[in-house]
Amino acid sequence: METIFAQSSSFGKAGVAVFRVSGTKSLEVLKLLTGKSNFKPRFMYYQKLTSPESNDLIDNAMVVYFKAPNSFTGEDVVEIHTHGSKAISIMLTNALLNIPGVRLAEAGEFTKRAFLNNKFDLTAAEGIADLINAETIMQHKQAIRQAGGALEELYNSWRSQLLRIISLLEAYIDFPDEDIPESVLKDVTNTHKTLINTISEYLNDNRKGELLRSGLKLAIIGPPNAGKSSLLNFLMRRDIAIVSNIAGTTRDIIEGHLDIGGYPIILQDTAGIRGESNDVIEQEGIKRAIDSAKKADIKIVMFDAETLDSAVNEDITGLIDENTIVIINKIDLIPENRIFNIENKYRCLKVSIKNNIALPSILKNIEEIAENMAGFTETPYITNERHRHHLKQALVYLKDFNLDNDLVLATEDIRMTMRRIGAITGIIDVEEILGEIFKNFCIGK
């Protein structure tokens, strides 16, 4: 393989910039840049870096050499830590590009090489990508568990059970004259049933892992002037939505990203829902608001306390489900003990966005719903549609398995099940999917 390099840190001004080189020429590259020939693996050296072509000084840097296979990629690897200057990064990049047999790495190529050198499986590689992209504590927790091999361990345990079934069936096929106990087939049947139940239950997870990975969508809906935009601004801790007393001010969906209790929340402020608007643009905004609410994972339905009874309609209440928070806003403008009809049907939070009354209860309720929808369990979740696709296919083959049929055909169903699970971890030949997975990494990883 060619020797590759990339800047692993962000390009721009910083205290330190990190370059990574991987491949058979890594040590040669280090010698050319430093003029030094003796580098002990895993020791950091302070060295002057110069251009091999012009001999111009690039920087005073810290360098370290990792000898294969004891490196991230499993190849000879060199790391170069320079000052975080754009000029230095450009000069070092040009110097490396001018060394024969050395090229710039593609996105995710270092991690791809690590996978190909059996440093980890595909699920761990995807976990590393998720770890890099994690923005909240819960996303980090999920990603680091996956990067640590939790999914690999789970899928390999299923694969081992399938392999055992195959070995038992092939014993029957290859040695028909041998006295093989009937309990063997009973063992096969029990393991088969257990796997069907286990994988079926695992797939029936309400996509918790994928929700945590991508973020839970929260739509704020309700009639005009209920305080939806004010709530969005409060949750975002800045003004991103225009607030006015004019009905129909918000016409398109306004989106913001938030971390609540470690869960990634994608907030969507929508147009006020009312039935009497003659404004074509506002009507389109209302349609989008309803569509957004139907697709949302969590909903906040917000009413103005002064106009609540007249504002309640089926377009709004029809969107309320178990993951909906009903909020009555502007309670500072009504008698303290007033009870609304809607409270007889739904649990409501009474707040005042303007006067900061009971606002922490909104955050608490959002966090509780998010935890219920994407909270952690001991068993790692499916985090990727790719995994789900292969598991569904595996389950089809598993359900097709029937010992009453020809044993060779039955064994093939188990073999295909095992291949589908192997496609998730990369145990089988999966060259066609590697590019799709690793292209989502940043350059230098």
Swiss-Prot record:
Q: List the disulfide bonds.
A: none
Q: What is its EC number?
A: 3.6.-.-
Q: Does the keyword Metal-binding apply?
A: yes
Location of the TrmE-type G domain: 215-371
The annotation note on the cofactor reads: Binds 1 potassium ion per subunit.
Record-annotated membrane-spanning stretches: none
Summarize where K(+) binds, as residue positions.
N225, S244, I246, T249
Q: Kindly give the Gene3D superfamilies that the UniProt entry links to this protein.
A: P-loop containing nucleotide triphosphate hydrolases, Probable tRNA modification gtpase trme, domain 1, tRNA modification GTPase MnmE domain 2
Q: Which residues bind (6S)-5-formyl-5,6,7,8-tetrahydrofolate?
A: R20, E79, K119, K445
Any idea which GO molecular function terms this record carries? GTP binding; GTPase activity; metal ion binding
Q: Enumerate the cofactors the protein uses.
A: K(+)
Where mainly found? cytoplasm
Residues that, per the record, bind GTP: 225-230, 244-250, 269-272
Show the SUPFAM superfamilies listed in the entry: P-loop containing nucleoside triphosphate hydrolases, TrmE connector domain
Return the broad EC class. hydrolase
Subcellular location per UniProt equals: Cytoplasm
One example of a Gene Ontology biological process annotation: tRNA methylation
- Keywords, sorted A to Z: Cytoplasm, GTP-binding, Hydrolase, Magnesium, Metal-binding, Nucleotide-binding, Potassium, tRNA processing
Q: Which residues bind Mg(2+)?
A: S229, T250
The cellular component terms of Gene Ontology attached to this UniProt record, alphabetical and capped at eight, are: cytoplasm
Q: What does this protein do?
A: Exhibits a very high intrinsic GTPase hydrolysis rate. Involved in the addition of a carboxymethylaminomethyl (cmnm) group at the wobble position (U34) of certain tRNAs, forming tRNA-cmnm(5)s(2)U34.
Kindly state the subunit structure of this protein: Homodimer. Heterotetramer of two MnmE and two MnmG subunits.
Identify its protein family: Belongs to the TRAFAC class TrmE-Era-EngA-EngB-Septin-like GTPase superfamily. TrmE GTPase family.
Q: What's the protein called, per UniProt?
A: tRNA modification GTPase MnmE
Q: Which organism is it from?
A: Rickettsia bellii (strain RML369-C)
Q: Corresponding gene?
A: mnmE
